[in-house]
Regions:
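Residue-level signal for pocket-adjacent positions within structured domains
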Residues: 22-32, 39-41, 46-49, 53, ...
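Glycine-rich, phosphate-binding/catalytic loops in enzymes
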Residues: 36, 86-87, 117-120, 216-219
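Conserved G1/Walker A P-loop phosphate-binding module
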Residues: 1-111
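Conserved Switch II/interswitch segment of TRAFAC-class P-loop GTPases
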Residues: 42-47, 74-84, 95-157, 170-182, ...
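Amphipathic alpha-helical transducer elements in NTP-driven molecular machines
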Residues: 34, 48-51, 64-70, 84-97, ...
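C-terminal-of-GTPase-core extension/linker across diverse P-loop GTPases
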Residues: 2-8, 13, 19, 146-346, ...
Length: 357
């Protein structure tokens, strides 16, 4: 299953620099507003050290990670819903994203202007949230007259009308659909931005990354959403380094892992996703499924025929397989299980599906 995250933020917050680091693309990242006009789209492999281990065990010719698509759009300014800056029409580029990643500037650099004149993360977060709420309110108010007409003719449309009216009330009160906990099913066709889960990237400098009290204050600003702290410029440098050099560089900074790795992992957790693995001489591959998915659904991610003709799944946990040293040893230890249609997949399951079509 494809996973797409839309990147939003004020101009000069570091969105395009982050996107460049994520995708290793050379997207224009300028120190003036609206450097990004058309959306930039990049597909990123999710770092997963388990793949290299499997490739060694199975002598795989290649590894294929799970992927995340990132969409970087123009900076949003206060009043965008009323036409300020570039307006908000470009938000359509992320309406079908699964989640929204808001990049918020924490670093202070006199050479990089702030559109509001001063660095203020709380104000920036409020600005973006307000503009997304207003954009959704415009969408809802545009569709309401049509729904009201349809509901008069077809009673089956009453539920949809009720859901949209409820969404209108929530948005008019300045709340997001997601935070209000509304049932998003009836609203799915509207692709409302605030119905999506949010995660927050705070773009810091190296001193701020080491400032735990500051990070706790920023984390509290967005709780219960996830907060990720990184320096987008440093992340851009890290992706150009050899792995050993990058690890040494991070260790000197007192950082456990690259911020980009944290972002990918948090994105999966935020959306309730997990990974299962397949391995063989041709390739070792990571596949994305929702948490709670049963074996036939996982099989269908590989190919619809696997789901239609599902018989059973041969499953071993990654940790058990590594401990055993080979599938042969894992079978001898009784660690390889045959699971049926009701088996709930676990993160890190190494699977071979049996099917018949």
């Amino acid at each position: 299953m494809a996973l797409t995250i839309g990147i939003v933020g004020l101009p000069n917050a570091g969105k395009s620099t982050l996107f460049n680091a994520l995708t290793r693309n050379d997207v224009l990242a300028a120190s003036y507003p609206f450097a990004t006009i058309d959306p930039n789209i990049g597909v990123v492999g999710v770092p997963d050290p388990r793949l290299a281990v499997l490739a060694e065990l199975f002598h795989s010719a290649r590894t294929v990670p799970a992927t995340v698509s990132f969409v970087d759009i123009a900076g949003i300014v206060r009043g965008a819903s009323k036409g300020e800056g570039m307006g908000n029409a470009f938000l359509s580029h992320i309406r079908e994203a699964d989640a929204i990643c808001q990049v918020t500037r924490v670093f202070d650099d006199p050479d990089v202007t702030h559109v509001d004149g001063a660095v203020n993360p709380a104000s920036d977060i409020e600005t973006i949230e307000t503009e997304l709420i207003l954009a959704d309110l415009q969408t809802v108010e545009k569709v309401l007259p049509r729904l009201e007409k349809e509901a008069k003719i077809n009673k089956d449309r009453l539920a949809a009308l009720s859901a949209v009216k409820q969404a209108q009330e929530v948005l008019a009160a300045g709340r997001t659909i997601f935070a209000a906990g509304l049932d998003r099913g009836p609203l799915r066709d509207l692709f409302l931005l605030t119905a999506k889960p949010f995660l927050y990237v705070f773009n810091c400098d190296s001193d701020e990354l080491a400032n735990q009290p500051l990070k706790e204050r920023l984390r509290a600003l967005v709780a219960p959403a996830e907060a990720i702290f990184l320096d987008a410029k440093i992340e851009s440098e890290l992706v150009e380094m050899e792995p050993d050099e990058a690890r040494e560089f991070l260790a000197e900074m007192g950082v456990a892992e690259p911020g980009l790795d944290v972002l990918a992992r948090v994105g999966f957790d935020t959306l309730g996703l997990q990974i299962f693995l397949t391995a063989g001489p041709k390739e070792s591959r990571a596949w994305t499924i929702r948490k709670g998915a049963m074996a036939p659904e996982a099989a269908g991610v590989i190919h619809t025929d696997f789901q239609k003709g599902f018989i059973r799944a041969e499953v071993v946990s990654f940790d058990d397989l590594v401990s055993a040293g080979s599938m042969l040893n894992a079978r001898a230890r009784g660690q390889v299980r045959l699971e049926g249609k009701d088996y709930v997949m676990a993160d890190g399951d190494v699977v071979e599906f049996r099917f018949n079509v």
